[in-house]
Amino acid sequence: MKNEKINQLCVEVKAELEQNILPFWMQKMIDCEHGGFYGRITGKDVLEASASKGAILNARILWTFSAAYRLLHKEEYLETATRAKRYLIDHFYDTEFGGIYWELYCEGNPLDTKKQIYAIGFAIYGLSEYARATGDAEALDYACRLFEVIEKYSFDAEKNGYLEALTRDWRPIEDMRLSDKDENEKKTMNTHLHILEPYTNLYRVWKDERLKKQIVNLVNLFLEKILDTKTYHLNLFFEDDWTNKYQIVSYGHDIEASWLIHEAALVVGDLDLLKKVEPVIVKIAEAADDGLNPDVSMYYENFVCK
């Protein structure tokens, strides 16, 4: 009975993907005038063609259609993924200083040139998935370039971990926040999670020893610095020395981290690391259950103390 329900869910999810989600982006969001994809459409399907274009949106489109092509082998998915790859490299990539611009005008010129490490991580995620799906050398090359700039400019060799954001030319920046609701701290759980995720995917197509070392380091950072070992929820915001001043629970990030940490240990093939993380990720997943409602929806966050 359980397997039947899972199989039925798989059928429903695949249908939703192919009949609704992917066609939406291919039919409504391709910008034929300026290239790439439109940056905004309202909930009532009103296109805002002059809206700015964000790096995260473009990188996620790249990952999505690359993964769809890898699994479903449809040429239209490859065409859309290639469009996203081309636009990311030609417009979002900073040819002078390296890295990815945060935001572009609708025409494709830089609007906000800060280097948000979260966005660079998603660019690696999308490019590495395209390389995984197609064997494309250019996508892999740019993914590796982005790995190098994160390691050169964001990695804190003294106190460990990764800085949240920097200026275009990699100097300290006053406002490091990913969004207005976030705390303005130098290190965050969210960015570390979305460095771990793309680094893991990059390792699938680039068996580099330094990359592997940093993946293992990131997993250990989650276990030793980010995880609250009393509650098994993740702490969210930190000073550069890993001091945590907030008690905010993000249930969605808890469940996301539980499988991304496990996936990382599996992909690098470190059996000792796998034995270390497996009992912990179960406890993280169980802690995420605190946010479940009777209708199986989940609370967004719980501000225990801020």
What would you call each of these model-derived segments?
Residues 1-306:
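Glycan-recognition and catalytic cores of secretory/periplasmic carbohydrate-active enzymes
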